[in-house]
Amino acid sequence: MNMAQTVTQNPRGVKTLLPLDVELRNVFKFFNQEPAVHGVDLDVKQGEFFSILGPSGCGKTTTLRLIAGFEQVDAGKLLIQGQPMTNIPPYRRPVNTVFQSYALFNHLNVWDNVAFGLRLKKSRKSEVESRVKEALKLVKMESLRSRFPSQLSGGQQQRVALARALVNRPAVVLLDEPLGALDLKLRKEMQVELSNLHKNLGLTFIMVTHDQEEALSLSDRIAVMNQGKIEQIGTPQEIYERPKTSFVADFIGDTNLFSGEITVLEAEYIQIVTKTGLTIVVARNEDTPAELLKSVVVSVRPEKIQLSLYPPSSLNNCFEGRLINVMYLGTHVNYLVQLINGININVLQPNTFGNLPDRETPIYAWWAESDCLAINQMTND
């Protein structure tokens, strides 16, 4: 089989070739003549944990359904392990899907739910026995094999759904918001289990989620979608630290955005005057767009901003303001600061267990030139 490959670098910097498990080439999907998926291009490498992240209605679930075969591509190409998937039904694709709703059969116990797909394929009884046993062991559900779904917790049902997907030994496991129905504590626990399962099996996982933290913590790479299009693909660190668009900067985590125009453009820094009159200096580095437009957006993460009662000496990006809200979050404290030009900014600082300042306290907010990022202002931003 001639499988497409992608170039990557190992930790020593030596280029190697990795096969691609899933490829989308300029893929479109229309509903009522409106594009739900609009010219999507992406490659998913073999053994990768790849997440498609975006808000409701962005096209991420439709993209997953196209890969699974539940929807058909209207234009473009979709390949799995180098083979075109045009008109290939779901049951003939080397993929299995884990749904948010689990989709377990209530009248079947755990063992029979996991065995269902193998029996449908008329697998030998001995093979069904060994593979179901192996799958249940992977998800730590051997002792509950005789229970019915109604007798299981949400986390246990999720494990059964995972086992049912893994028992068929697919090349690609598709996860449709798999942890969305779980409470926060259980979701955190299942994130760890899902990550360990992926590492132990070495399979390709493609997950759809709207949960930024979930995508950042689990993924090797993330594709951020918006209005049917891919805004950016990168590692979690690249997506968070080096967003390419203001949508990505705003959607991934929290950020403070300032729209303005470049007034000084030097080799080492950029000076921007915002629409509200602030002058912000941004250090130029490898993350700065090669071609900057006159209109830009400055992104500053809340955790990059410092607060002090007195102005630091000879420092750019220092602005006077007042505290208008203080929110205690346990390990951190979130401050809402209104700058002298009337703009509100969010500041996140570690909890030092001291007395919190009162509201209306005059304060100075400042950040380093290297802690903010200039992004080209697009027409739809």
Curated annotation (Swiss-Prot):
Ligand binding (ATP): G54, P55, S56, G57, C58, G59, K60, T61
Domain ABC transporter: 22-252
Subcellular localization: Cell inner membrane
GO cellular component labels: ATP-binding cassette (ABC) transporter complex
MF GO annotations: ABC-type putrescine transporter activity; ATP binding; ATP hydrolysis activity
Keywords: ATP-binding, Cell inner membrane, Cell membrane, Membrane, Nucleotide-binding, Translocase, Transport
PROSITE patterns: ABC_TRANSPORTER_1, ABC_TRANSPORTER_2, POTA
Catalysed reactions, as listed in the record: ATP + H2O + polyamine-[polyamine-binding protein]Side 1 = ADP + phosphate + polyamineSide 2 + [polyamine-binding protein]Side 1
Keyword flag Protein biosynthesis: no
UniProt protein name: Spermidine/putrescine import ATP-binding protein PotA
Organism the protein comes from: Trichormus variabilis (strain ATCC 29413 / PCC 7937) (Anabaena variabilis)
Phylogenetic classification of the source organism: Bacteria, Bacillati, Cyanobacteriota, Cyanophyceae, Nostocales
